């Protein structure tokens, strides 16, 4: 059996650029990609916290240390500079791989600084 699981998440990243005429994709600071384990050209989903848009594209490496999150091409209609987004990558895992599975969760602060990391989402309480 295979299960599709959350592999990596950049939580509450800020969009720094929206480039409609760029070829497409989402440029992510290379350091953030490495920290999260997101690969260049990997399929990602982006959830816009500010306007509710949800869309799919692929990641490209942005300049390391730049804090760039650039939503490009047609997706630029769905996010604007300053919007808070959640960027997720998913992967398929076998039952054996799930035994030790842990996602990579990166929590962002203002200016796309990393404020924390985790490998588990806390239990939601009523």
Swiss-Prot record:
It is found in: Cytoplasm. Gene3D superfamilies: 2.40.40.20. It holds the Pfam family Asp_decarbox. It comes from the Bacteria. One of its GO terms (cellular component) is cytosol. Pathway: Cofactor biosynthesis; (R)-pantothenate biosynthesis; beta-alanine from L-aspartate: step 1/1. Is synthesized initially as an inactive proenzyme, which is activated by self-cleavage at a specific serine bond to produce a beta-subunit with a hydroxyl group at its C-terminus and an alpha-subunit with a pyruvoyl group at its N-terminus. Substrate binds at residues 57, 73-75. The active site is at 25 (schiff-base intermediate with substrate), 58 (proton donor). GO terms for molecular function: aspartate 1-decarboxylase activity. Its cofactor is pyruvate. The modification Pyruvic acid (Ser) is found at residue 25. It catalyses: L-aspartate + H(+) = beta-alanine + CO2. Belongs to the PanD family. Heterooctamer of four alpha and four beta subunits. This is Aspartate 1-decarboxylase.
């Amino acid at each position: 059996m295979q299960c599709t699981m959350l592999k990596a998440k950049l939580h509450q990243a800020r969009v720094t650029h929206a480039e409609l005429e760029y070829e497409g994709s989402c440029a992510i600071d290379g350091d953030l990609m490495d920290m999260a384990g997101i690969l260049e050209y990997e399929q990602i989903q982006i959830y816009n916290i500010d306007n509710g848009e949800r869309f799919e594209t692929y990641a490209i490496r942005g300049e390391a240390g730049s804090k760039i999150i650039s939503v490009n091409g047609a997706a630029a209609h769905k996010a604007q500079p300053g919007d808070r987004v959640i960027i997720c990558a998913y992967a398929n895992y076998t039952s054996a791989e799930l035994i030790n599975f842990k996602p990579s969760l990166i929590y962002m602060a203002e200016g796309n600084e990393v404020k924390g990391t985790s490998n588990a989402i806390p239990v939601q309480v009523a």
